[in-house]
């Protein structure tokens, strides 16, 4: 947050517009590769696409005045202006490469701080609208696909253990969302009393252990419960190849199973990256943009089923 300015939820429209202008000016001078776009200037379909890509939040889209966003062309860093706080700087990286994600965000933060004065307390650190973010103001989050643990009935125990270690466990859409497709977002709960490097090391270490447990669960599925695994894959592939209507949630559940099969080498003509692409492309905004037309919910369900059936038509199981 900027020093001397009201937090967004307490600010007037004029206050938020002033903050947006200050951030736009700072970006133009220190990070010209990122161009600021006001929320009011983003079309409805593009809003859906940005949300589905996890670049902006639904809360930001509710800002009729003073909301803004800027994203790098390669998608490694994104800035939200006047969401819950004046600035939300996000860094993204694939895999468990938390250091790169942190570096992208930290480098931009350092450049912006040359032009902006942040609200900071010697006793508390960075001041934020939500007390749970006070201190470093850092959330280090990892997306994990844990279908193997789910099929073995062990996911609840893992989630409980993570929460006891003061980690937040949410669905793919973040706070308040369900873990559709057994994709979980795990992040630090504490931001006060520990520095940024310590947060990143801790989240990385614990998530690496969860990944190890998921790999172990997949091995045990093959060795001890192969019928459970094969049935899950066969049912999902059959529905995706033959369904005439598919909601977003249904498609994600079935694609989750194919992602597991691809990762375990049990599907022909299918890689994990292919499934990740399909998971994004079957979302409402991406689907409509890809097909070049706006559709009703029922029309999207029909076109989603047709789109996915064509994409997985040649996929077969090796088991």
Question: What do these predicted regions represent?
Answer:
Residues 1-123, 138, 150-152, 157-319:
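Long, Pro/Ser/Thr-rich low-complexity/intrinsically disordered regulatory tracts in eukaryotic proteins
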């Amino acid at each position: 947050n900027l020093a001397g300015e009201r937090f967004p939820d307490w600010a007037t429209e004029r206050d938020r517009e002033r903050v947006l202008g200050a951030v736009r000016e700072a970006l133009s001078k220190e990070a010209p590769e990122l161009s600021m776009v006001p929320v009011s200037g983003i079309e409805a379909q593009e809003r859906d696409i940005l949300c589905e890509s996890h670049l902006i939040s639904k809360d930001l889209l509710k800002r009729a005045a003073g909301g803004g966003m800027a994203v790098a062309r390669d998608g490694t860093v994104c800035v939200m202006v006047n969401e819950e706080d004046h600035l939300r700087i996000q860094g993204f990286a694939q895999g468990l490469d938390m250091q790169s994600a942190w570096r992208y965000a930290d480098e931009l933060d350092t450049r912006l701080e040359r032009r902006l004065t942040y609200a900071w307390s010697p006793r508390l650190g960075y001041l934020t609208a939500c007390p749970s973010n006070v201190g470093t103001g850092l959330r280090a989050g990892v997306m994990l696909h844990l279908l193997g643990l789910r099929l073995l009935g062990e996911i609840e125990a893992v989630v409980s253990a993570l929460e006891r270690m003061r980690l937040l466990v949410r669905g793919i859409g973040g706070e308040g969302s369900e873990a559709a497709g057994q994709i979980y977002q795990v992040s630090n709960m504490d931001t006060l009393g520990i520095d940024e490097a310590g947060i990143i090391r801790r989240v990385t270490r614990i998530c690496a252990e969860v990944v190890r447990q998921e790999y172990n669960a997949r091995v045990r599925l093959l060795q001890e419960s192969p019928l459970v695994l094969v049935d899950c894959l066969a049912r999902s592939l059959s529905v995706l190849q033959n369904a005439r209507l598919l909601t977003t949630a249904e498609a994600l559940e079935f694609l989750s199973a194919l992602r597991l099969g691809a990762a375990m080498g049990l599907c022909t003509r299918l890689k994990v990256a292919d499934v990740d692409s399909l998971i994004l492309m079957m979302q409402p905004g991406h689907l409509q943009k890809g097909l070049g037309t706006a559709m009703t919910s029922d029309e999207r369900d029909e076109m989603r089923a047709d789109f996915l059936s064509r994409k997985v038509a040649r996929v077969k199981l090796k088991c």
